[in-house]
Amino acid sequence: MNTFGQQPTNPHAQDLLDMAMYCDHFSLYHQQQNQQLPQRPAAPPATGYGLNEYSSPPSSPYLWLNGPAINSSPYLNGGSGSPYFPAGYGGGQRQFLPPSSGFGVADFPWLSIPNQADLLKMVRPPYSYSSLIAMAIQNTPDKKLTLSQIYNYVAENFPFYKKSKAGWQNSIRHNLSLNDCFKKVARDDHDPGKGNYWTLDPNCEKMFDNGNFRRKRKRKSESVGAGFDEDSNEDKKPLALKSLGSDSPQGASVLEQSSYDAAPEGKSKAPVGSAAQDSSHCFTNFASNMNALINNRTPRQFTAGRGDFSNSRHYLAELTSCPIPSPQISAPQTGSKVPCYPSKQQNNLCTSVMNPFGLNHLYSREGEV
């Protein structure tokens, strides 16, 4: 127990003492190894550096944009701290970009340009040529400008257009001549000068209001459609009705039918003329003839293996005597049409009438030749 109590508190203390003894015996080996290997820099002290040994953070986050991130470190030549790199490591290096005299760090810390005006010269304004013309005209008290005055306004307010004037000036002229929103106004007699004035069409002023100059010009079809009178029934009539006219009987019937079709939904549409009365009279005659055909059925006579259709022809002749309405008066639509067969019994009757003949009419009975 006493031997355990005499051990040092650190369990690795004995190992460190043993390693120190072995290192003393091999001191010659260490001297030879130090002669062969290059001299390593001394390790920095364990206590750390003082606050005065650290440099201020670089003003630019990128090393290649004129920042002092390379030459201002205390670890390079001339630093107050411990020389981590050998002397002369960064002495022959140079900055990637030369320092700029007018660099605005507060405005653009990531871009090396003289000032903000140079940036505006490189960026094209997000406006079309017609929008630029409208802006120039609206910013004048007289609301009219000559071509040269429009050029001057664009060049003064947008530095991008100060270069290569030939290109955008041609576009300005084309927009003035092809766009319907711009109107040419002649000069007055008391106004000397060269060139006509250009003004903005009053119908197109809403396209450039509230500083929104990016909207496209309105199509001609929309402007024409806006002037159409929706309450005019004369314009809504088809060409066929206009050509027939209301004087001719065909035109009167078609107009009557078109007025029936044009009735508003939700209201009952009355049938045209006496079509309902004719259909009811036709159905009455049809039902009476069919009842007579079914109840007073006569025995069939067969000759030469074929049926005798004389009676059937008689009843069919009576059915065809029903008056048919005029084809000029078309029947009403499905929603308001009077049903020709209102009951189920009449539907069955119609089915039997539509097929009055069976196979027995066409073929002889069994055993009869």
Curated annotation (Swiss-Prot):
PROSITE patterns according to UniProt: FORK_HEAD_1 (PS00657), FORK_HEAD_2 (PS00658), FORK_HEAD_3 (PS50039)
Signal peptide limits: none
Summary of the tissues where the protein is detected: Localized to the animal hemisphere of early cleavage stage embryos. Zygotic expression is restricted to the dorsal part of the epibranchial placodes of the head within a region located near the tip of the first, second and third visceral pouch.
The protein's name in its UniProt record: Forkhead box protein I2-A
Source organism of this protein record: Xenopus laevis (African clawed frog)
Keyword GTP-binding on entry: no
Compartments where located: Nucleus
DNA-binding region extent: 124-218
Keyword Lyase: no
GO molecular function: DNA-binding transcription factor activity, RNA polymerase II-specific; RNA polymerase II cis-regulatory region sequence-specific DNA binding
Function: Possible transcriptional activator.
Keyword annotations: Activator, DNA-binding, Nucleus, Transcription, Transcription regulation
Pfam name, any one: Forkhead
InterPro entries with a match to the protein in the record: Fork_head_dom, FOX_domain-containing, TF_fork_head_CS_1, TF_fork_head_CS_2, WH-like_DNA-bd_sf, WH_DNA-bd_sf
GO biological process: anatomical structure morphogenesis; cell differentiation; regulation of transcription by RNA polymerase II
Broad class of the protein's primary localization: nucleus
A cellular component annotation (GO) from this entry: nucleus
Species lineage: Eukaryota, Metazoa, Chordata, Craniata, Vertebrata
Chain spans, region Disordered: 215-252
